[in-house]
Amino acid sequence: APSEMCIRDSAYSVVHISAGEIDRRGIQNANLDGARRAISELVVEPGFVLVDAFRVPGLTIPQLPIVGGDYTARCIAAASILAKVSRDRLVTQMAEEFPEYGLEGHKGYGTQAHMDAVRRHGASPEHRYTYANVAAAHQTYVRSTKP
C-alpha cells in the first residue's frame, strides 16, 4: 500500500526525554534538545527541515518553522503521530511498572482518576513534578503521610 511505502521508505528518529530532564531543563529547552538529537540520529542527513512552530537553535541544516505545522505539512503531522504512538507505548510499559496509577486507562494525561491516584500514592519518578496539577496532588499525598 502507498501509505506503508511512505513510512517504510522514510527516515525518522524518535527520542525519549525523561520527566526528570523536562523538570530540570524546562519543556521548551527539552523539546529543542530532543529535536536536535532526533535530527542528529537520522540515518540520512536531511537537506532541509520543517519544524512545528519554532526555530531550533544550533542546527546547521536549513529549517523552516511552521506555526500549526502538524495541520499543514504532512511530514510534521507524521512526526506528531510517531511521537504520540511512541509515548503511548512507553506509558503502556510504565503501567506495568506502576499499576497503582491506572495508566492503561488515561495514558498518563491529567485526568481526575490520575490525579486521585497521585493523591493516594504520591508521584512516581516518571511524573513531571513541575506540572502544577501533579505538584498539588503530590503535596496532598505528602501531607496525608506526615505523622
Regions found by a protein language model. Give the residues of each.
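RNase H-like, Mg2+-dependent phosphodiesterase core
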Residues: 1-4, 8-147
